[in-house]
């Protein structure tokens, strides 16, 4: 099970004024660090190009860069990765820039590709066309996955136990990949929910993990951008502790993803493709 373990530089202490029934108090709080990251890519010996600037929590930037490039359609296969530059052992990009080198025999990109700015609350802001958003999402292959309901209700509990930054700040999202029998594979935290998903997808690509039988658990709502990233990565099941959006439901129904939301306590709602749940 992989998860963030280095907390240095990921939070900062702030002095504040707190008011309660007794009046004003001086207090301290830990807040989540948010910094920009420029994600670049280079094909062979060509000049590097900027894929975008994301606002993120500065940890596992290599995972984030690979996952982002994959969801943007610049990377299509882990074998295209020919090295990642600018990331320390702790997973933080030096100077907030990370460059992914792409094998020139396999790399290709849209010559009209423009640099994009992605803030920590929006995973699709700045994309140039609506058609481009849907282009890379394909139908999930038919499978025989069967998931016990007991596994589903256990996932948020397991993930929360791995959320070190959330326990310190209360202001961090998380995403995790689990096997169909509930074994944790990777957890990532980020101030942006879509960044957290990019991180676990990037990890799976770097490590060569087959995602076609896995479950994606997320800490926030299940909106379109989460479904988009799961569909591109070929993940068949999405679980959320919160609500879905109408478009997320429609896309999951169309593409064959199982969408499970409001996973709380011993209950949950299955919005699409309930055939993967044991009854």
From Swiss-Prot:
Chief location category: cytoplasm
Gene3D superfamilies: 3.10.20.10, Cytidine Deaminase, domain 2
Record InterPro entries: Cytidine_deaminase-like, FdhD
Domain of life: Archaea
Keyword Cell inner membrane among UniProt keywords: no
Any one GO CC term of the record: cytoplasm
Catalytic-site annotation from UniProt: 122 (cysteine persulfide intermediate)
Statement: the UniProt record of this protein carries the keyword Cytoplasm: yes
GO MF annotation list: sulfur carrier activity; sulfurtransferase activity
PANTHER family named in the record: FORMATE DEHYDROGENASE, SULFUR CARRIER PROTEIN FDHD
Name under which the protein is recorded: Sulfur carrier protein FdhD
Source organism of the structure: Thermoplasma volcanium (strain ATCC 51530 / DSM 4299 / JCM 9571 / NBRC 15438 / GSS1)
Organismal lineage: Archaea, Methanobacteriati, Thermoplasmatota, Thermoplasmata, Thermoplasmatales
């Amino acid at each position: 099970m992989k998860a963030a373990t280095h907390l240095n530089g990921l939070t900062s202490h702030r002095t504040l004024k707190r008011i309660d029934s007794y009046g004003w108090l001086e207090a301290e709080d830990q807040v989540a660090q948010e910094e920009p990251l420029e994600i670049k890519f280079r094909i062979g010996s060509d000049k590097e190009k900027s894929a975008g600037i994301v606002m993120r929590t500065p940890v596992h930037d290599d995972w984030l860069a690979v996952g982002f490039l994959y969801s943007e359609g610049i990377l299509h296969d882990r074998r295209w990765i020919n090295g990642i530059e600018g990331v320390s052992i702790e997973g933080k990009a030096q100077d907030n820039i990370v460059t992914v080198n792409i094998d020139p025999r396999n790399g290709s990109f849209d010559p009209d590709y423009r640099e994009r700015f992605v803030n920590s609350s929006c995973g699709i802001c700045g994309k140039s066309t609506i058609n481009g958003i849907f282009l890379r999402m394909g139908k999930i292959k038919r499978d025989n996955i069967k998931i016990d309901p007991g596994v589903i209700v256990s996932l948020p509990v397991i993930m929360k136990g791995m959320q070190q930054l959330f326990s310190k700040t209360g202001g961090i999202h998380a995403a995790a990949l689990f096997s169909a029998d509930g074994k944790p594979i990777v957890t990532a935290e980020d101030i942006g929910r879509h960044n957290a998903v990019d991180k676990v997808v990037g990890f799976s690509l770097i490590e060569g993990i087959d995602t076609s039988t896995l479950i994606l658990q997320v800490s926030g709502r299940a909106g379109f951008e989460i479904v988009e990233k799961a569909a591109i990565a070929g993940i068949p099941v999405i679980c959320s502790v919160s609500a879905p959006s109408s478009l997320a439901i429609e896309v999951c129904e169309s593409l064959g993803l199982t969408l499970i939301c409001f996973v709380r306590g011993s209950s949950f709602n299955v919005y699409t493709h309930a055939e993967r749940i044991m009854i």
